[in-house]
Amino acid sequence: MASETEKLLCLNTESAEIPADFVELLPPDNIGDIEAVSLETSVGQTIEVYGDVGVDWAHGSQYHSPVIALQPLVGSSLSSRDHDKEMFVVQTREEEVVGYQDSDNLLFSPEFGSQMVLPVNEDDYLQPTTASFTGFLAAENGQGELSPYEGNLCGLTTFIEAGAEESVNADLGDKQWEQKQIDGLDGEFPFTMWDDVNEKEDPIAEEQAGESPPDYSEYMTGKKFPPEGIPGIDLSDPKQLAEFTSMRPKKPKGDFPRPIACSHKGCEKMFKDNSAMRKHLHIHGPRVHVCAECGKAFVESSKLKRHQLVHTGEKPYQCTFEGCGRRFSLDFNLRTHVRIHTGDKPFVCPFDACNKKFAQSTNLKSHILTHVKNKNDQ
């Protein structure tokens, strides 16, 4: 495949015709070695010819670009009268053979966006063209567009850079990204990942979702119901009443920091270290341990073994108070039983003007039903 390297020579004239003595234009033989040469024109203007050293975009090597650049016209600014002048652009082409085997792939690489270089007619080695000076300035200022289809490759670099920038912007889209640090477990290094800012949840919604449910257990230990009752809870519903009376007071947290969050989605619990977090993760696991007698499933095998004591009738837990000796299958039942001996009645009726206390939550639940029934009958 052959590519075209162009040489431009721009002549400013006052008339719209090429001078008669301008018959043939030959490029200098060693233009790459020329740093700056002053030329005298017929109108007394001085122009300079530069040898531009750049990088060959096809081969990836340096080369001396055969581009002839002209000095600006007389005057720092152009008047409206100068804009109407016409400028002759004489383009000379020098053919060189490109031996790069993947040149086709390079020309149509995504780095160049939607731009494409078309081959030109090899017979047209000299093409005089005319262009309006106003249009030329507009193209240089970005208001116009130099089309590669017109045979002008001077703006090829600009097209390539613009196409590459548009390609990158198209890949990024409108999304915004930020780096997020993820802490690893013991023996693992923390790693960084990219997080989409647009897909972040609303901080207010996260805060509301992370809020723990109200602690109603205090109504079981002495706090009285408000006159309007508890919003959202109907104690006349047996299911809601059972959930209400089964609430346990939350254990007070220690003063030590808890920087490790549970990795399970929807769990807001925090832990002091990774080992505590891994131990907690078991409750989120599948309940693969199923009781053969009743079908109740458990996460841990130890919980299943403890449950099976109910079916086997084994009662390893015995009351130690003198003269009692009762035995129980579960330690929880033993702790509840001990309150009978100690006289501890932690469960207090939450209704106003009623101060009855109970040793077991089930007894308090039955007592609350009497209040609800009497209130509905009134």
UniProtKB/Swiss-Prot annotation:
Q: Does the keyword Repressor apply?
A: yes
Keywords noted in UniProt: Activator, DNA-binding, Metal-binding, Nucleus, Repeat, Repressor, Transcription, Transcription regulation, Zinc, Zinc-finger
Tissue expression remark: Weakly expressed by neuronal and glial cells in the cerebral cortex. Expressed by Purkinje cells and in the granular layers of the cerebellum. Expressed in all layers of spermatocytes in testis but not detected in sperm cells.
Record bears the keyword Transit peptide: no
Region of interest called Mediates transcriptional activation, as start-end residue ranges on this chain: 39-113
Please give the chief subcellular localization of this protein: nucleus
Name the InterPro entries for this protein.
YY1-like, Znf_C2H2_sf, Znf_C2H2_type
Give the subcellular location: Nucleus
Q: Which GO terms describe its cellular component?
A: nucleus
The protein's GO terms of the molecular function aspect are: cis-regulatory region sequence-specific DNA binding; zinc ion binding
Q: Identify the SMART domains for this entry.
A: ZnF_C2H2
Region annotated Mediates transcriptional repression sits at 243-378
Q: Where are the zinc fingers (C2H2-type)?
A: 260-284, 289-311, 317-341, 347-371
Role description: Functions as a multifunctional transcription factor that may exhibit positive and negative control on a large number of genes. May antagonize YY1 and function in development and differentiation.
**Miscellaneous remark of the record:** The gene encoding this protein appears to have arisen by retrotransposition of the YY1 gene in placental mammals. It is encoded by a single exon found in an intron of the gene Mbtps2.
The family note in this entry says: Belongs to the YY transcription factor family.
Tell me what this protein is called: Transcription factor YY2
What gene codes for this chain?
A: Yy2
